[in-house]
Design a protein with these regions (language model features):
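Short, charged low-complexity linear segments at domain edges
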Residues: 1-4, 33-55, 215-216, 338-347
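Residue-level recognition of specific faces of alpha-helices
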Residues: 11, 38, 60-63, 301, ...
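N-terminal glycine-rich anion-binding loops that anchor highly charged ligand groups
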Residues: 17-20, 30-35, 230-236
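Short, intrinsically disordered, charge-biased short linear motifs at domain edges
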Residues: 1-9, 50-61, 226-230, 349-354
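Cysteine-centered iron-sulfur cluster-binding motifs in ferredoxin-type domains/subunits
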Residues: 6-25, 54, 58-78, 361
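Non-heme iron-sulfur electron-transfer modules
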Residues: 25-56, 77-103, 424
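Iron-sulfur cluster-binding electron-transfer modules in prokaryotic oxidoreductases
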Residues: 80-465
Length: 465
C-alpha cells in the first residue's frame, strides 16, 4: 500500500465553521464526531501517534456519514472528503469489517446475489405487509424503508388531475389555433423533439437498488428524457457502481466493479445518465478511482437526470397543485455540486408550490449502508429532518429527493412519525405532470409489443419486473 496522502487536509486552521454543518456533531455534541475533531484524529493516524485499529479512532471515523456538508462552509477549502476516504482505506487495510457490513458489501459485489434478493423484496413489498408493519422499532423501520421504495400512489389529487386535463386541453387548442393561423409554421413540439433526439443519445446507468426496487423511477427517467428530445439506450453487463465499497474503504472491490461498468458503458453515447445521487457521484469520480484516460472520459459524460432535463428546459407539463418540499441529496448538492437543476425540473410543473425547508441541505442519515450498520446514529440524524417536516406550515404534501437511500430513509421516518407525506424522486413528479398534461399522448411507458422500456439485447429496461 502506498503512503496515505492526507495533503487535502492541510488548509484546515481549526476554525470550527464546519461544526454546525455536521449532522453527527449536531446529534452527539462530541468534538470527535465533528470534521475538525476527525481531522485531528486523521493527522494523529498519519503521524503514527495512534494505531489504525484503535477502537476510539475507528468509532469516530466510522461514524462520519460522508455527506460532505462541511466542505461548502469551509472558508479554507479543506478537502475533507478526500481525507476521510484515505483514512477509511487505511483502516480497511488494517482490520476486518464488522460481520454485518462485510456481509452487505459481499452481496452488492455479486449481481447473482443482490438481484434475487431485491426481487424477493419487491414481491414482499407487493403484498403490502411492509407498509402494515412499518414503525419506529428496528424491524418496523426496515419494513418502512422497503415500503417507501415503492411507487408513491395517489400523489396527484383528483382536483389537480382535473386542472391538469383542462390545461392540456387548452394547450391543445392553442396549438391547433396557431397551426391554422400560420401556413408553413413549425410542427408541434413533439415532432421537433423527435427530430432532435438523434443528436443526443444517453446511456442509462441501471445500478442495483434503482434497477430493482426503484424500476419505476427508471421508467419515469426514460419517458421524461425522451419527451425532451433524448434517445435513451441501456447497455448490458452493468453492475453495482461500487459506491458502497468505496465508502467502506474497500478500494479494490470498488475498482473491480468500476472496471465492469466502464466496459459496459464504453459504447458511443453523448451522456451517461444517472438517477441516483450516490451512484452519480462515484461514476463522476471513476477517473480518479481507476486513474485511466478511458475512465476519465466516461466520468466526463456522466450527468444526473435533472441536469439533462434542465439543459432542455425541461418542457412544461400539466398542472399539479401540490405543496412540495425539495430535499437535496448530499451526494448531489455537495459531491456533484448540482443545485439548480432539480429545482428547474420541478419549476417546469405548473401550479407546483416548491419550498426549501431549513433541513433541506442536511443529511438524512441514510449514507449507503450506514443506516443498516449504525441505525441509532442514523435515526438521530434523521429525526432532525423529520421534525422540520412536521413543524412546517403547512406541512408539505410531498417531499422530492433524488437518491434511493434518501427516499427510503426519509419515507420510513415519515411513516414512523405518523405524517401523511409522500416521498418521490423529482422525475416522478415531472412524469406525472407529463401524463396529466397529455405530453405522452396516452402512450406513456408503452412500446410496440409490450411493456415499458427500450430493449437492448433482449433485456427489459427500467420496467417493473
Amino acid at each position: 500500500m502506498t503512503s496515505p496522502d492526507y495533503s487535502s487536509l492541510d488548509p484546515c486552521v481549526h476554525c470550527g465553521f464546519c461544526l454546525p454543518a455536521c449532522p453527527t456533531y449536531l446529534a452527539t455534541g462530541d468534538e470527535a464526531d465533528s470534521p475538525r475533531g476527525r481531522i485531528v484524529l486523521m493527522r494523529a493516524l498519519e503521524r503514527g501517534e495512534i494505531a489504525a485499529d484503535d477502537e476510539g479512532l475507528v468509532q469516530h471515523l466510522d461514524a462520519c456519514l460522508g455527506c460532505l456538508g462541511c466542505e461548502p462552509v469551509c472558508p479554507s477549502g479543506v478537502g475533507y472528503g478526500r481525507g476521510i476516504q484515505v483514512a477509511r482505506e487505511q483502516l480497511f487495510a488494517s482490520r476486518r469489517l464488522p460481520p454485518l457490513a462485510a456481509a452487505v458489501l459481499g452481496v452488492f459485489s455479486r449481481a447473482w446475489l443482490w438481484r434475487p434478493l431485491f426481487t424477493v423484496s419487491r414481491w414482499l413489498r407487493a403484498t403490502g405487509l411492509p407498509a402494515r408493519l412499518a414503525g419506529g422499532g428496528r424491524v418496523g423501520f426496515g419494513m418502512g424503508m422497503l415500503a417507501a421504495s415503492g411507487r408513491a400512489r395517489g400523489t396527484t389529487p383528483r382536483e389537480t388531475r382535473a386542472a391538469g386535463a383542462a390545461g392540456a386541453a387548452a394547450q391543445a387548442a392553442r396549438t391547433a389555433a396557431g397551426a391554422a393561423g400560420a401556413a408553413g409554421a413549425a410542427q408541434p413540439a413533439e415532432s421537433a423533439l423527435r427530430s432532435a433526439a438523434a443528436t443526443a443519445t444517453v446511456a442509462l446507468f441501471r445500478g442495483c437498488v434503482m434497477d430493482t426496487l426503484f424500476a419505476h423511477v427508471h421508467d419515469a427517467t426514460r419517458r421524461t428524457l425522451e419527451a425532451n428530445g433524448y434517445r435513451v439506450v441501456v447497455p448490458e453487463g452493468q453492475v453495482c457502481c461500487g459506491a458502497l465499497h468505496e465508502h467502506a474503504g474497500d478500494r479494490a472491490a470498488a475498482e473491480a466493479l468500476a472496471r465492469i461498468n466502464l466496459a459496459a458503458l464504453a459504447e458511443a453515447s453523448d451522456y451517461v445518465v444517472v438517477n441516483s445521487a450516490g451512484c452519480g457521484a462515484l461514476l463522476k469520480g471513476y477517473g480518479h478511482l481507476l486513474e485511466s484516460e478511458a475512465a476519465g472520459a466516461l466520468a466526463a459524460k456522466v450527468r444526473d437526470v435533472t441536469e439533462l432535463l434542465a439543459e432542455r428546459g425541461p418542457r412544461p407539463g400539466g398542472a399539479l397543485s401540490l405543496d412540495v418540499a425539495y430535499d437535496a441529496p448530499c451526494h448531489l448538492q455537495h459531491a456533484q455540486k448540482v443545485h439548480a437543476a432539480p429545482l428547474a425540473v420541478l419549476a417546469a410543473i405548473p401550479a407546483l408550490r416548491i419550498r426549501i425547508l431549513t433541513s433541506s441541505d442536511k443529511c438524512c442519515g441514510s449514507a449507503g449502508i450506514y443506516s443498516v450498520v449504525r441505525p441509532a446514529m442514523a435515526r438521530a440524524v434523521l429525526d432532525l429532518k423529520i421534525e422540520s417536516f412536521a413543524e412546517a406550515d403547512p406541512v408539505p404534501q410531498v417531499v422530492a429527493t433524488g437518491n434511493p437511500g434518501c427516499l427510503m430513509q426519509i419515507g420510513a421516518g415519515i411513516r414512523a412519525a405518523g405524517l401523511r407525506i409522500r416521498v418521490v424522486h423529482p422525475v416522478e413528479l415531472l412524469d406525472e405532470s407529463y401524463r396529466v398534461g397529455g405530453v405522452y399522448g396516452g402512450k406513456a411507458g408503452r412500446r410496440k409489443g409490450g411493456k415499458a422500456g427500450r430493449r437492448e439485447g433482449g433485456q427489459g429496461v427500467g420496467c417493473e419486473r
